[in-house]
């Protein structure tokens, strides 16, 4: 199925690219989320008419993500207190939601879907550098310090 991308999508293409994708990917992900439209003559004409508007919107989103990345990088270590045993092993874990809530409480909006924990949740006390992906092109690192509750 041929589609026109309305957003930059990792490993697929940029705004305005006509790409061929599997029908299920288009029908279940790209089209419902508004990231693409079916590539037919009428949609191509509509897209070309709206191209400048869509590019301006993408540029504004990128600028906002860069601003948030600067704020996140400027943050001191975000402290999360959790119950832990004698050897620093947590009773439970610190996950995406906990990190996002702590960063939001520190003054920078962060959604749990933007937090990247490739090795899974944090299960020990200590200092960690957690990557956050604010935009397809913008990544930042937030310092998280997990301490034992008194």
UniProtKB/Swiss-Prot annotation:
GO terms for biological process: translation. PANTHER family: 50S RIBOSOMAL PROTEIN L9. PROSITE patterns: RIBOSOMAL_L9 (PS00651). Binds to the 23S rRNA. GO terms for molecular function: rRNA binding; structural constituent of ribosome. One of its GO terms (cellular component) is ribonucleoprotein complex. This is Large ribosomal subunit protein bL9.
């Amino acid at each position: 199925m041929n589609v026109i991308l309305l957003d930059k999508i990792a490993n697929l293409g940029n705004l305005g690219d006509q790409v061929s994708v599997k029908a299920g990917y288009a029908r279940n992900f790209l089209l419902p989320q508004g990231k693409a439209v079916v590539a037919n003559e009428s949609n191509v004409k509509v897209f070309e008419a709206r191209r400048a508007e869509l590019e301006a919107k993408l540029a504004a989103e990128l600028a906002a993500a860069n601003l948030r990345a600067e704020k996140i990088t400027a943050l001191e270590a975000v402290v999360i207190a959790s119950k832990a045993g004698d050897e620093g092993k947590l009773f439970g874990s610190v996950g995406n939601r906990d990190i996002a809530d702590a960063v939001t409480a520190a003054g920078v909006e962060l959604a749990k879907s933007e937090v990247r924990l490739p090795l899974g949740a944090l299960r020990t006390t200590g200092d960690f550098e957690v990557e956050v992906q604010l935009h397809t092109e913008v990544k930042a690192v937030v310092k998280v310090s997990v301490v034992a509750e008194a």
